[in-house]
Amino acid sequence: MKRYEGKKVVIIGGTSGMGLATAKMLLDGGARVLVTGRSKEGLELAQKELGSDAIVVPSDARSLTDLDALAVRTKAEFDTLDLLFVNAGFSIRAPLETITEAIYDEMFNLNAKGPLFTVQKFAPLINRGGSVVLTTSIANVKGMAGNATYGAAKAALRSFARTLAAELIPSEIRVNAVTPGPIDTPIVEKAFPAEAAAQIREKMIGMVPMKRWGTSEEIARAVLFLAFDATFTTGAELPVDGGWSQL
């Protein structure tokens, strides 16, 4: 029997990077997996990479209407869940003098509001003994210039992990957070011009005690540990950052 045989999983933000790597490991282990994303191209590439066993659904993690529809779809596909991995998120770097209300709202809508309502709408589907894993960020513990709104939104999400863990204990659902440091995903190149992205990569390597970027697979292994192995752990945050937040 495969390690995750019979497990039913939804990954919010699962069409690239850390979410996609987690989906691959779960599918390889025999799980049934539904992943979401916004980009048509990303959805198509994810379906191709994950294969026909994966359910790939267009859904905007900021939209409560989309989340309602996704919960209905999940109920129809799986009936119940063993893991909800809330991974959708994005950073807009904005120094203090350039922050606008639109940037503030975008960062909190995607990185805090969306995850909170995702858990609210999916909690009734999660089996006793099931798990929620939220993706926070090293930006919620490290003061980084230009990250005021993103870091604050991720800090709010970290707080949600604690509170939701307390609220869902009666249902025997654990809630934890995985906290990535610099991870080698396309997000840097999407957020910055090529030259700036290269400079950021080099600068971050210098800050990380282990002197390298992490991989999506390293995040995926941490997520699966929290989801299925850490059965006496809830409300916790697991840094996967090469020691940056600790040393």
Language-model segment annotations:
Residues 95-96, 100-108, 204:
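Substrate-binding pocket helix/loop in short-chain dehydrogenase/reductase
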Residues 125, 212-240:
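C-terminal substrate-recognition "lid" of short-chain dehydrogenase/reductases
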Residues 15-16:
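Conserved glycine-rich cofactor-binding loop
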Residues 169, 174, 234-235:
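Short, small/polar-rich loop/turn modules that mediate ligand/substrate recognition or access, typified
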